[in-house]
C-alpha cells in the first residue's frame, strides 16, 4: 500500500522512518498558509492541515495521503515560522521564561476517500533565556522556517524546563497518534 507524505518538512520524513514507514512519495502541497483575520491558532492549524490534504483531493487515488501542520503559540498569538533573523530573535524573547503550546494537526485520507483527523498539543516551558543564549542559538540557523523559531531536537532542547505531552509532536509529527490514525485508516 502506497503512502504519500504531503509535506515539505524533512523532520516528518525522519519521524515516519522511526515507525519503519517510508512514503512512496514526498510532495510539498503548494497552498496559501496565510492566517485569516480573527483566526485562533488551533483553528488555523486544523485548517492548514486540511487544506494541504484538499490539495491532493483528486490525485493519488491509489494511495493513502498524510498531511500535517505544526504551530507554536502563546494564548491567542501564533509564533509563526520565519526566515527573518530579527523576528526569530523576538520570538525567542517572547518564549523566554514562559509556557507555550505546540500543536500538530494531522489529516489522513485512506483508499476509500475517508478522512481521519487528529490534533495533538504539547505544553513546553522555556527557561529564562539570556541574550547570549539567544545569540548563540541564532548562529545555529536552527530557527529558520520552523514553528516557534526553534528545533527541540537541537541546541534549543537545553532551553526546555519542562515538556508536557508528545516530544515528537514538537519535532513535527506525534508518532503515537500518527501510528494509530494510520491503523484506523487501514494503512498496512
Question: Can you name each region flagged by the protein language model?
Answer:
Residues 1, 22-24, 63:
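A structural micro-motif
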Residues 2-21:
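N-terminal beta1-alpha1 ligand-phosphate binding loop
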Residues 3-4, 40-188:
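Anionic-ligand binding patches
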Residues 8, 29, 111:
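Cofactor-binding loop segments of dinucleotide-utilizing enzymes, especially the Rossmann-like FAD-
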Residues 12, 33-35, 115:
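Flexible, glycine-rich phosphate/dinucleotide-binding loops
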Residues 15-18, 36, 58-59:
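Short loop/helix-cap segments at secondary-structure boundaries that form the rim of catalytic
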Residues 20-23, 186:
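Glycine-centered loop/turn motif at secondary-structure junctions
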Residues 23-34:
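A short beta-strand-loop structural module common to alpha/beta enzyme folds
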